[in-house]
Amino acid sequence: MSASKRDELVQNALKAFYTGGFHAIGMDRLAKETGVSKTAIYSHFRTKDDLILATLRLRDEQFRNWLVRRVEALAKDPKDQLLAVFDALAEWFAEPNFKSCMFIKASSEYQDRSHPVHAISAEHKKLLRDYFTDLAKKAKLKKPEDLARQILILKEGAIVLAHLHDRETVASDAKQAAQILIKTATE
């Protein structure tokens, strides 16, 4: 299988896992949904978990690149960019194929913290927190690490609530809470 076919497999597997879950999608179903035989899948991925890790790496890259681009397009000032995170989330929540966060799902299906799937999910959240810390430092806000952690908590809570039932208002509600946190960090 060529690199482009492998990449296509990872992209199609990402879609299957995102919509169907990790444990619920067996290799037979995955082969059917991706159009790739199990033999071909196993020629590139020793185990299903290896394929899952590849999809999570791809999703991490896609999501963080998308978020940074959207935030930078929505606001220029670092303080405003912290708030623009929630505007970007509102756009994501409005997409018809929104199915929550792949990393929240992965960590809930692989709860053992030492499992590589759980670890890559935790790393994704750490990288987002680092991005928020960087913005808070650029904005010269007080206790930037604490603020970044709080912004991350609001973001993650908004994702869960948007998934459960409240897509229309949850991002703006989280943004209002973030405004209070940022105002406090400014004073």
Q: What do these predicted regions represent?
A:
Residues K143-L161, A177-I180:
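Hydrophobic alpha-helical segments that form the core
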Residues E61, D80, R113-K138, R149, ...:
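Amphipathic alpha-helical packing segments from all-alpha helical-bundle domains
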Residues M1-S4, T186-E187:
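N-terminal intrinsically disordered/low-complexity leader segments
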Residues K126-K142, L164-E187:
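C-terminal peripheral helix-coil segments that are non-catalytic and often amphipathic
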Residues E8, N12-D50, A54:
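Helix-turn-helix
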Residues R57-R64:
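Short, basic, alpha-helical segments at the C-terminal edge of helix-turn-helix-like DNA-binding modules
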Residues A54, V68-E95, K138, A148-I151:
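Hydrophobic alpha-helical connector segments
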Residues E95-P116:
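Amphipathic alpha-helical segments used for helix-helix packing
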